[in-house]
Amino acid sequence: MSSSPTPDGVTPAEELPVEPVPTPSSFARAMILVTVSICTMLYALTVTIVNVALPQLQGALSATPDQIAWVVTLNVIATAVVTPMTGWLVSRLGERPLLLWAISGFAASTLLCATATSLETLLLYRIAQGAFGAPIVPLSQSILLVNFTGKDRPMAQGFFGMTVVVGPAVGPALGGYFAEAHDWRWVFYLIVPLCAVAFLLVITFIRPASKEQSAKLDWTGFLALSFAIICMQLLVDRGERFDWFASREIIFYACGAALAFYLFIVHTLTSDAPFLNPQLFKDRNFALGLILVFIYGMLNFTPITLLPPMLHDLKGYPDSLIGLLLAMRGLGMVIGFFTAGRLGWLDPRVTFFVGMVLNGISGFLLAAANVDVSPDAIAWAGVLQGIGSGMMWVPLVTMSFATLPDRFMPDGSAIFHLLRNFGTSIFISISFMVVVRTARMNYAEFAENITPYKESLRFPVVTGAWDLETVEGLARIGDEMDRQAQMVGYDNAFIMYAIVCFLSLPLLLLVRVKRG
């Protein structure tokens, strides 16, 4: 929460004399970049690294699939609730102390997760982990944006962006290796040394900055926004599992989110000191950037969420090969970030346009896959998608924060990453809904055309080893129909992915770019 305007329109930050801050040297700025990147990476890794250990966790803690899902859900909810508080926490503690507290709490809660002996204690520690980790990414980006301006910002954002996006991409591979070689506890132990390194780097290279005047927390706005966030996150996480609005629980979440969000907006527009300063959203580029980062969140993690179950269930690929194919996407991201950083002189709308088009093309390539698709085809589509995502991130940050005043950076960065995470959660849920429902429809269509009385299916060249006269033969062909129907479901999800890419392009026409 940034300092809110007083009735005469002057913010408390403007009333206080601000001492000029000396410009850091090139080496100091380079170390600031390394520091905030490592801080971000240690949090970004935990976003996906735990997912691969869920089967082990379920067995070790004697939990049902629905119960073990809360290990992910509660962590995401805690992160989403605390993220908007980053600006207010900065005004109370300062950037450097807050970052140190966040890293310390994150390390302690991660270590406790590794020592959990019951599902209840693990869930409690995961909530703490999400809450302490929430300020790390927006705070790191805020520090970066203040220290890198002008022509230096694109290259710095390119390096920083790799840790934001590549971390979750390599998380499953690392988590899978340590979970198989040791056990699920090592998924958490792995993060602790990174926390220690990040803590030492922050102490050494992040300078204490002058605090803004401490602002009171707008509890009404905070609680309304928090309740809306909790309901929305539960809705998207549990919607498909409970058949969406056929469930009273999901209807309650939807109504609760709508009501709480309405109260938050009304309170923000009428309060003298709201939780989020409305001046944030008066910046045209930042407001458009929030829409674009929501779309970016929709696109970025969806492929790496859809591909593992598709390749494992329909192709029978081992986890090692799936991890390698996902790593190819990470390689593409590195290329994309580096390319976007080197193209800092180019209109950021052009770079973003190219990245979005590459994402759309990769979506159509994956949508053309069938059950006989080769690993090479998946790898090529992944590289292309990675390059596109990398090329989108740098100009997205450049456009969004180009005209936002420094005093709004903590709040702006927090909302920016909150919407990115929401976009990811919502689109992944929608994508799996498309997979499940269209697969069910296609299975029904296949079944209409597969009967023992159809003459064309009596030829050996068609049936192969299937004997339609036996129960076993019918079961085998039923399994194959299910496999083909699921493949069509995944294809439909990737078609939707590609369509979203191309339909989003006209938004770039609304972005204004400073000339000269």
Describe the role of every protein-language-model region.
Residues V192-K211, S226-R238, G256-T270, L505-R512:
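C-terminal membrane-cytosol helix-exit motif in multi-pass small-molecule transporters
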